[in-house]
Structures are given as structure tokens and as C-alpha cells.
């Protein structure tokens, strides 16, 4: 769950007071933090790596795969693992 389920500024768990703008200020934070696409590719017999390779694709956050967000000190918004 990220930033109190997308409710930045709601309760002590977010560690931001009313300055965040209240509940559901960033409803898309939860959706982008939990949407991940994993692509697994097995090398051919001619490949020299001899193992599985994994690539992670993400449409947002520059490929950041973290799912825990934390509010900034100015309560201006939430940033996921400083990947914004």
C-alpha cells in the first residue's frame, strides 16, 4: 500500500498534516505504484549467459519498481523512492 492508500494528508501514517490538501489528493499514486509488467526471456541454446534474464518495464517513475511512497517534508506531494 502506498501513502495511506493514496490518501496523502489523511492521518498520522502519512506524516503530513492538512497541508497536503486532504484525502485522495493523489488517487493515481496507488495505481501507478502497483501496476508492474514483468517480461521473462530465456536465452537460446547458443547464448553464453546460461541463465534466465529478467527485464522490468514500467510506464512511469523511470522504471522504479518500489511500492512504498513517502510524503516530502513540505507536504507538497508524494514521491516514490525518490524516483520522480
From Swiss-Prot:
Signals that turn on the gene: By Fe, Zn and auxin in roots, and Cu and Mn in shoots. Down-regulated by cytokinin and cold stress in roots and shoots. Down-regulated by Cu and salt stress in roots. Sinergically down-regulated by RAC1 and sphingolipid elicitor.
One BP annotation, GO: reactive oxygen species metabolic process
One Pfam entry name: Metallothio_2
A Gene Ontology cellular-component term: cytosol
UniProt cross-references to InterPro entries, sorted A to Z: Metalthion_15p (IPR000347)
UniProt subcellular location: Cytoplasm, Cytosol
Coiled-coil features, chain-numbered ranges: none
GO molecular function, one term: metal ion binding
Protein keywords: Cytoplasm, Metal-binding, Metal-thiolate cluster, Stress response
Tissue specificity as recorded in UniProt: Highly expressed in inflorescences. Expressed in roots and leaves. Expressed in root primordium, pericycle, phloem and in the basal parts of lateral roots.
Other comment: Down-regulation by RAC1 during pathogen infection may potentiate ROS which function as signals in resistance response. Plants silencing MT2C show abnormal plant growth and root formation.
Biological role: Metallothioneins have a high content of cysteine residues that bind various heavy metals. Acts as a reactive oxygen species (ROS) scavenger in the cytosol. Possesses superoxide anion and hydroxyl radical scavenging activities in vitro. Plays a role during root development, lateral root initiation and seed embryo germination, possibly by regulating levels of cytokinin.
Family affiliation: Belongs to the metallothionein superfamily. Type 15 family.
PANTHER family xrefs: METALLOTHIONEIN-LIKE PROTEIN 2A, METALLOTHIONEIN-LIKE PROTEIN 2C
Annotated protein name in UniProt: Metallothionein-like protein 2C
Organism of derivation: Oryza sativa subsp. japonica (Rice)
Organism lineage: Eukaryota, Viridiplantae, Streptophyta, Embryophyta, Tracheophyta
Gene coding for it: MT2C
Amino acid at each position: 500500500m502506498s501513502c495511506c492508500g493514496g490518501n496523502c494528508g489523511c492521518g498520522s501514517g502519512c506524516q503530513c498534516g492538512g497541508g497536503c490538501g486532504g484525502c485522495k489528493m493523489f488517487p493515481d499514486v496507488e495505481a501507478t505504484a502497483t501496476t508492474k509488467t514483468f517480461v521473462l526471456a530465456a536465452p537460446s541454446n547458443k547464448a553464453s549467459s546460461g541463465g534466465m534474464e529478467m527485464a522490468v518495464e514500467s510506464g512511469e517513475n523511470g522504471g522504479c519498481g518500489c511500492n512504498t511512497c513517502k510524503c516530502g517534508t513540505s507536504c507538497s506531494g508524494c514521491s516514490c523512492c525518490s524516483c520522480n
